[in-house]
Each structure stands twice: as structure tokens, then as C-alpha cells.
A protein has these predicted regions:
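Compact Cys/His-rich, Zn2+-coordinating modules
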Residues: 95-105
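Arg/Lys-rich amphipathic alpha helix in sigma70-family domain 2
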Residues: 4-10, 133-136
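Short, Lys/Arg-enriched alpha-helical recognition elements, typified by the DNA-recognition helix
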Residues: 1-4, 13, 153-155
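C-terminal catalytic core of Y-nucleophile DNA break-rejoin enzymes
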Residues: 30, 88-90, 99-100, 109-133, ...
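Basic, Lys/Arg- and aromatic-enriched nucleic-acid-binding interface segment
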Residues: 9, 15-71, 75-77, 85, ...
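Short, basic (Lys/Arg/His-rich) helix/loop patches that form interaction surfaces
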Residues: 46-57, 67, 120, 137-146, ...
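Non-catalytic DNA-binding core/recognition domains of DNA-processing enzymes
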Residues: 1-3, 17, 122
Length: 170
């Protein structure tokens, strides 16, 4: 722009380039994601189940692998979202831990797009078994309900009975 202002050139050839690049994305090719094979998933879950250090993560890993839920969707699951009779999970919110209005805390957010709100099938009996067992254990261990923005009956909790953070899983 300085060269245009000083009459060295009549038109800035780079004007609007940044806007164009920004609208096209970062210009970097998208990372190729490679899904775990069934065998890799079995090995992963076997490792977790036998590990004294990681075995407490087995229920959340079974649900994540068996449903394809995002971590915030999984940690935000409530008993009302899970229908074990019809083997479905209703996805309509996420549990996040962020700084909002200057305060770091857990918050409920809704999916960014309409397609983010969905009902997914529970295709594997292991997922239903883990969810059923978790609900029973959480009810027994933590009879006091956590409530966040009207949502209650959270299935996944940390060892203290509070919300399970996605940061711990990631």
C-alpha cells in the first residue's frame, strides 16, 4: 500500500490475497487420518484392561472406540442421553473445560452444526455393558447428582466424583 500511496505502482498486486488465502483455509494439505484396525483396537483395549496404571480408563475407551463419539460428547453423556433398551445414544451437547468470562470451569455447549446433533446406534454389546455398569457404579459411588446448565446424571466422572475433563483423556 505504501508503494501505491507514493505513486511507485498504480495497483497493489497483493491486495486481497490474505483474505483469499484465509477463505481457502491454511493452504496446508489436510492431514490424513488413519483409523485403527479391528485388531489394533482389540490390542489397545487388551493393553488398557491389563494395565494397573490405565485400567480405570477402559470404560471411556470402549465407549469412544465403539461409538465414534468425540471426547467432549462422551464426557458430557448423561443417563438421559443413553437408551439401553433401544441401543441408542442421543448426542446434543458437549462438556468442555474453558475460560469463559474470565473464569476457567466446565461448561455445556451445543454442537457447532445441525449435523452434530444426532442419534447414534450402540452397535457393540461391550459398549452397552460398559455404559450399564458405569451407570450402576456411579449411582452407588456418587449418589449426589452433578448439575450443569440443566443437565444431570453425568455418566463419566473423575475419581473425586466431579466432571471428567477431556484434557485427561486426550
Amino acid at each position: 500500500e505504501l508503494a501505491v500511496d507514493d505513486d511507485y505502482i498504480r495497483k497493489n498486486p497483493s491486495k486481497g490475497v490474505y483474505r483469499s488465502l484465509k477463505s481457502e483455509g491454511s493452504g496446508k494439505p489436510a492431514k490424513t487420518r488413519i483409523a485403527l484396525t479391528k485388531e489394533q483396537q482389540k490390542n489397545y483395549l487388551r493393553f488398557i484392561s491389563k494395565s494397573p496404571m490405565y485400567s480405570h480408563w477402559l470404560p471411556v475407551m470402549v465407549v469412544l472406540l465403539g461409538t465414534g463419539l468425540r471426547v467432549g460428547e462422551c464426557t458430557g453423556l448423561t443417563k438421559n442421553d443413553v437408551d439401553l433398551e433401544n441401543n441408542t445414544i442421543s448426542v446434543n451437547h458437549n462438556l468442555i473445560y474453558r475460560v469463559i468470562d474470565g473464569k476457567a470451569d466446565f461448561h455445556i455447549t451445543t454442537p457447532k452444526t445441525a449435523s452434530g446433533t444426532r442419534t447414534i446406534p450402540i452397535l457393540y454389546p461391550e459398549v452397552a455393558e460398559q455404559l450399564r455398569a458405569l451407570i450402576e457404579v456411579m449411582d452407588a459411588l456418587y449418589p449426589e447428582d452433578l448439575v450443569m446448565n440443566g443437565y444431570h446424571g453425568f455418566i463419566f466422572r473423575n475419581r473425586s466424583g466431579y466432571f471428567l475433563s477431556a484434557h485427561n483423556i486426550n
